[in-house]
């Protein structure tokens, strides 16, 4: 059991197989109170032997609106993520909540309960849950903040590229833990793209601008199914950043973004997220009389984006658009 594992002195963990350690960690991450479990592991001093890259987060300070250091923030995101997922399960009753933020969440996103349940029932690997992979990604989402921390002239703390670099670190750990490629890819996407939700939220709150169809299309093109996880992490990240200082306005903006993304993904995917294919590469090459090459893939992607934004809706329009693009490329 985990407890016996703990009883061996921390330094003996080096002798335990990475798979065995991984299984224990994933059991904790996929089970109840993942935040408390990770806090316990940190206090027991086992991270240097299990996941040394996590130790650096402790005590790393951040600017407003953050109220916690990077490690405390990470734990609080795990806690909020657990609560958010629980409040979206089938059979959750609003009476269970006495907290305004959760109430607003279930009001805005409650209609997606069945889709969320199906999302977590999908398997990336027979031995481990999608849920555990999501919590692993949340544990690592800010892992590269310590390494990317800088302070600008105004005294603001910045963490440039911590998302992209964090995805690489988590992916490396995933390989050492012998996770499946599907799991590693899911974890990478969640960490790499975790700032996009915040950009959407602040644009909506600050400029009253909803994400464009192009932005929604690109979000899911890059994230795929991980887009659902990104919405959950985004909401948990916001609560774990502001804590008690979170305003109803910001939370409502975030829930609107969540709703917009999820309804596009789940309720009308053929409109923006995954428009139906109007023609394939061979047909395009025939129509334009061009040989195989990178340009074919680029044109097909540009057509899809045109469909997503509503500019292109028929095969004829797709061909005409491609002719124009090809001309531009040739004269460019």
Task: Tell me what each language-model feature is.
Residues 1-131, 135, 139, 143-161, ...:
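Glycine- and charge-enriched loop/helix tracts that form the active or gating conduit
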Residues 30-38, 122-128, 145-147, 209-217, ...:
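Short, mixed-charge, low-aromatic patches
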Residues 44, 177, 236, 287-288:
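Residues at alpha-helix termini
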Residues 46, 83-85, 140-145, 196-198, ...:
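Short, glycine-/Ser/Thr-/acidic-enriched flexible segments
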Residues 60-69, 96-129, 179-249, 270:
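Histidine/acidic-rich helix-loop-helix segments that form or flank divalent-metal centers
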Residues 133-134, 229, 272, 281:
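Alpha-helical hydrophobic/aromatic positions enriched in membrane-embedded helices and signal peptides
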Residues 179, 197-209, 240-332:
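Terminal helices and disordered tails flanking the catalytic cores of nucleotide-processing hydrolases
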């Amino acid at each position: 059991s985990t407890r016996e594992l703990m009883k061996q002195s921390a330094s003996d963990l080096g002798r335990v197989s990475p798979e065995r350690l991984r299984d224990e960690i994933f059991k904790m991450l996929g089970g109840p109170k993942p935040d408390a479990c990770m806090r316990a592991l940190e206090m027991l001093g086992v991270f240097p032997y299990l996941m040394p890259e996590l130790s650096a987060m402790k005590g790393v300070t951040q600017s407003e609106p953050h109220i916690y250091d990077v490690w405390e923030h990470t734990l609080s995101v795990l806690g909020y993520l657990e609560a958010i997922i629980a409040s979206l399960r089938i059979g959750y009753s609003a009476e269970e909540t006495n907290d305004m933020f959760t109430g607003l969440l279930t009001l805005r996103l409650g209609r997606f309960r069945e889709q969320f349940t199906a999302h977590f029932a999908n398997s990336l690997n027979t031995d481990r849950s999608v849920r555990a992979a999501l919590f692993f990604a949340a544990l690592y989402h800010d892992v590269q903040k310590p390494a990317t921390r800088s302070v600008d002239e105004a005294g603001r703390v910045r963490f440039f590229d911590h998302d992209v670099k964090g995805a690489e670190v988590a992916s490396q750990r995933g390989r050492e833990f012998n996770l499946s490629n599907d799991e590693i890819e899911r974890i990478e996407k969640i960490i790499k793209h975790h700032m996009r939700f915040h950009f959407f939220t602040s644009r909506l709150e600050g400029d009253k601008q909803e994400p464009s169809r192009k932005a929604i299309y690109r979000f899911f093109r890059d994230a795929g199914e991980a887009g659902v996880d990104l919405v959950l992490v985004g909401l948990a990240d916001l609560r774990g950043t502001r804590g008690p200082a979170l305003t109803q306005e910001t939370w409502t903006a975030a829930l609107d973004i969540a709703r917009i993304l999820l309804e596009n993904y789940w309720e009308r995917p053929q409109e923006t997220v995954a428009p139906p294919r109007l023609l394939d590469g061979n047909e395009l090459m025939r129509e334009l009389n061009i040989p195989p090459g990178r340009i074919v893939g680029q044109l097909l992607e540009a057509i899809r984006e045109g469909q997503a934004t509503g500019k292109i809706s028929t095969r004829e329009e797709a061909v005409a658009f491609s002719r124009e693009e090809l001309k531009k490329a040739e004269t460019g």
